[in-house]
Amino acid sequence: MPLIELSGVTKTFRNGELAVEVLHGIDLTILPGEFVAIVGSSGSGKSTLMNILGCLDRPTSGSYRFMGRNVAAFDRDELALLRRETFGFVFQSYHLIGGASARENVEVPAVYSGMPPAERHARATGLLASLGLGERIEHRPNQLSGGQQQRVSIARALMNGGRVILADEPTGALDTKSGAEVMQLLNKLSADGHTIILITHEREVAEQAQRIIEIRDGRIVADPGPRPRSGLEPDFAPHVDRTSPLSDIVEAARTALRALRANIFRAALTLLGIVIGVAAVIAMLAIGDGAKQDVVDRISSMGTNLLTVRPGAPNQRGRDTTATLVLDDVRAIRDLPNVLAAVPEQSSTVTIRSGNADHRTSANATGADFTLARAWPIARGTFFGAADERSYATVAVLGQTVAKALFGDADPVGEFVLVNSIMFQVLGVMGPQGATPWGTDQDDVIFVPYSTGSLRLFGQRHLRNATIAVEDVAAIDDTQAAVHELLQARHGGIEDFQIRNMASVIESVSETQNTLTVLLGTVAAISLLVGGIGVMNIMLVSVTERTREIGIRMATGARMKNILQQFLIEALVVSALGGVIGVVVGLGAAAIIEAFDTPIVYSAPPVLLAFGCAFATGLVFGYLPARKAARLDPVVALASE
């Protein structure tokens, strides 16, 4: 059965409305094991015929059968499979991958057939050694002579068996000696049973073949016909496809890293865009989360289980509402379910003096349960009790700021101070509380019994506000409703008070801070987007620069998905490396910012989000260049410089 059979094959190239037919009704039969030379002058159509024979191109019309199968009906992947398993190409200009060693160039066809690394390393090394290149296995093409490069090309053609060797002007770029060595190799391969199809314009080279076919102006003008091979035909066992998704990905990643090393400066600039984007996202979100946590902590320090009742109708102005909340209201609230403590509060600015030191501060008249209601511990001494309230005792508890201002590091407990010229004895010092979210120093205060303060300091019985602590925070809304109902009933149905829920305040502030954090993250994400555009730009440049390499890989059996996968993974490798470095830089930047007393919160989600976005950026922005590479025409790609 014929190995190759062409019948009425034509090939027409179109450029807009202009059509040029370069092959006219080619009829050709080649038997297994033949050494055929196709000879013709430049422009005769011999290279176009070789491209069709090697499944790099398709005929415009006519029939092409390989071992009885209609090749014209094959899709691109089936043609790639046929090239990978059957054909080996030897090109005039060698077509070696510049950034790969001799061994790596030879291994390319085996990569796409799924041959395990150890096995293909051994086979490539053996082939190169048999061709006299055993000491130049790790040399790159620019370190080899023309004859040595052509021998590497022949070794590559034999890597997957090379049942059919297509040699396009294999001696055209060589000196006489190197050309003779290449022809000796081709004759030896023919003797070993390989089918050799030699394309040349030199008659003396063609005469070394067993059969000479002459082509002129796209037509075969001389062909003595097939010459059956004498003797037994060698056994070219069918290849077993050993490819797997994992091995494909690993090989694509190796190729990607090699490509990045070949253009290290450009790769670094591309990485920089991703690094800046990822680092900005992580640092910005850490700052935003830190600011949110700081505000929430400050509000929480005032109590998360608190309800605050203030006098005055909500959303109304111009009314005298200062006397609408009284002590009996607080006593009634204490009897409601889920109320842990309810304390009255009055306050005013006072001058407190000890010896020669005086200090302007806020005096807060409150109840004995204040520390329970506000969960504010005593640092030294004690807080006043119910007996002090009943007896109108002139006792006070100092905040940390006041104690420091009047007594320095000395212990003020038991000492006497003048508050607006009234003598008070210091019972204790409150624990540090810090500033409110609005910047007010909570430690710049003194506490006195409500009865004493209202009578001797403020001269009024109505309250500035009442603080209510609930036992079960989950039921705080129900408790708020009960307080509202109670006070409205006590005030004759008039809503002349306001109730503020600290849990709601925290929730509202958290939502606001979350919005600001998202805004910060969005601004930072724009940097990542710009980095992604940089990845796409560089990958498009890479595809353009490596067009010939893509053609070489297609000629040696790479399918569309292999090329797509290779360039997509290359983009992902760039993005992943940039993501990893960006995470480190982002965390480092956050740590530096934290050293300047800026609140920072480290958490895994922003890191994972930033890295995931970087990875997704590589996937999205790498797809278009990868798709462009995968859709290249092998013949056009090989012809690219």
UniProtKB/Swiss-Prot annotation:
As for subcellular location, the record says: Cell inner membrane
- Which keywords describe this protein according to UniProt? Antibiotic resistance, ATP-binding, Cell inner membrane, Cell membrane, Membrane, Nucleotide-binding, Translocase, Transmembrane, Transmembrane helix, Transport
Which EC numbers characterise this protein's activity in its record? 7.6.2.-
Q: Which residues bind ATP?
A: 40-47
GO biological process annotations for this chain's record? response to antibiotic
Q: How does it sit in the membrane?
A: Multi-pass membrane protein
| One Pfam match | ABC_tran
Please name the Gene3D superfamilies in this protein's record. P-loop containing nucleotide triphosphate hydrolases
What EC class does the entry list? translocase
Top-level taxon: Bacteria
- Entry's Gene Ontology molecular function annotations: ATP binding; ATP hydrolysis activity; transmembrane transporter activity
User: Where is it predominantly found?
Assistant: membrane
Q: Which residues cross the membrane?
A: 267-287, 516-536, 573-593, 604-624
* The keyword Translocase appears for this protein: yes
GO CC terms of this entry? plasma membrane
Pinpoint the ABC transporter domain residues. Answer: 4-242
Q: Which InterPro entries match?
A: AAA+_ATPase, ABC3_permease_C, ABC_transporter-like_ATP-bd, ABC_transporter-like_CS, MacB-like_ATP-bd, MacB_PCD, Macrolide_Exporter_MacB, P-loop_NTPase
UniProt lists the family membership as follows: Belongs to the ABC transporter superfamily. Macrolide exporter (TC 3.A.1.122) family.
How does this polypeptide assemble, per the annotation?
A: Homodimer.
Which PANTHER family does the UniProt record give?
Answer: MACROLIDE EXPORT ATP-BINDING_PERMEASE PROTEIN MACB, MEMBRANE COMPONENT OF TRANSPORTER-RELATED
**Biological role stated in the UniProt entry:** Non-canonical ABC transporter that contains transmembrane domains (TMD), which form a pore in the inner membrane, and an ATP-binding domain (NBD), which is responsible for energy generation. Confers resistance against macrolides.
The name this protein goes by in its record = Macrolide export ATP-binding/permease protein MacB
Instruction: Tell me the organism.
Output: Aromatoleum aromaticum (strain DSM 19018 / LMG 30748 / EbN1)
Classification from the root reads:
Bacteria, Pseudomonadati, Pseudomonadota, Betaproteobacteria, Rhodocyclales
Q: Which gene encodes it?
A: macB
